């Protein structure tokens, strides 16, 4: 069931990589700030592309991110659903849950924090959410980015830096020396092998599998 989604408190920094990690991806020595402006922009693009690939929902105002944010969802209940599929996963704090205007306590709900699934319960029984609005406020995402997510973002950053340093249409290059320096370049015709139409290549996307949301109608 689709909800109305709002970011209440956006992440202070939506980037998955620190500037130190971006410097390392660029092969710079620690403390070398000569390319910080370029790398900060790269980090923002990489994080945004990973959020898109992972189908992270946004509110149309703030940049979607896997970093920790406080959000609010309103579900218009039909009186026949026993499970709410929250838009964000990896939930660290469930702040407020109301059903048809009545606030629930912790014992009234059961949360799968990693999957972002919320049930209405009474003891050991699962209940159906009553007709009307169900409002859920919670904090989801990472304060500290997991190492595997950092690794995938670093791989994508290195790929982007490598692509920027060469012409992707060049198939091969040869240099002849004897008289005058002669350079010959062969170009790909048609699609470039290994290229991808999406923002994240398949091998990196595979590393992100546990962070990809499943779209719910």
Placement of each model-derived feature along the sequence:
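Divalent metal-cofactor coordination and adjacent catalytic microenvironments
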Residues: 1-217
